[in-house]
Amino acid sequence: RGLILRGIKMWNEEMIINLFFQKHKKERLLWELSTNKREEALKSLHDLKYVKKEIMHPIPYYTEKYLEKELKKFGNFTNVYYMGLSYTGMLPLKKAIERSREEDEGCIIYCGEGIGYCHTDHEEGAPLAYLLKVKNYRDIEKNYDCTFGTEGIEEWMLHE
């Protein structure tokens, strides 16, 4: 058995909150994520009224394969940071997209380079889906230790 994930760029929740969410809501969300209100905070992440409107670009609720293809137009994203009620952490892009389809409450996927995806539940029809594009992502990412490593990676991802 060998390590198949080497040099994975690691992100964290605080950086993702700072990239995608409105200034007046960031501090509260970060506090809630670090307390026993975590589940409540994760639910509120998917309330799109707190996402910066200028970075939200509506897209159709694509099939898994097509969504992967669309996200890869912006970069060769292999591993992403996934935030949902059932799981939060690093995943391969394909697994993150598969998992996103299982989240009733919605999710956020951060691919890197200021590119993300989110969807939220919708009362009728397909969920509302958005491509998230942050132009000044380098200014925000530089304040965080986005180290390369395997911390937070599930065991099944580390072995052949």
Task: Name each model feature, range by range.
Residues 1-160:
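Structured alpha/beta or helical-core interaction and ligand-binding surfaces enriched in interleaved
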